[in-house]
Design a protein with these regions (language model features):
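Residues marking helix boundaries in flexible regions
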Residues: 19, 33, 60-63, 83, ...
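A common structural junction motif
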Residues: 29-33, 71-81, 90-96
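Extended Gly/Ser/Thr-rich low-complexity repeat segments
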Residues: 22-24, 64-85
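Amphipathic alpha-helical binding modules
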Residues: 80-117
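A structural detector for beta-sheet-dominated domains
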Residues: 7-10, 56-58, 102
Length: 117
């Protein structure tokens, strides 16, 4: 499977935020029974007190995750809902980090049409 850059993270507490992100992505792996579905960029950039790094996922991993969450909540149609889950988890952990899509448009933008057939 191909790795794609999905999320871009800006963090002031590198160690704490990496731990929180690993926790939430490990839970995602347990939900869909898949291993090695995500990885972090090998090197983080540091500037002005912030660390910047990318989270890469396998296309199959994110598709299964969207399908799983769509079954639980039909409003989930693409990875935007996954981004919200991650952002909410970081808020609960009182993290100041920012997470967003690594590009302008989500990877699975039109994928939900297949789910609704």
């Amino acid at each position: 499977m191909t790795w794609v850059s999905l999320f871009y993270v800006s963090s002031q507490d590198f160690e704490g935020d990496i731990k929180s992100l690993k926790t939430v992505f490990s839970q995602f792996e347990k939900q869909i029974h898949q291993k090695d579905g995500y990885r972090f960029s090998p090197e983080a950039e540091f500037a002005m007190g912030w660390y910047f790094y990318t989270i890469y996922v396998k296309i199959g991993f994110i598709k299964k995750l969207v399908e799983y969450n769509h079954i639980r909540d039909p409003k989930v149609k693409d990875e935007k809902a996954i981004l919200k889950i991650v952002q909410n988890y970081l808020k609960i952990q009182k993290s100041k980090s920012r997470i967003k899509f690594d590009r302008d448009k989500p990877t699975l933008r039109g994928y939900y049409h297949w789910l609704l057939r």
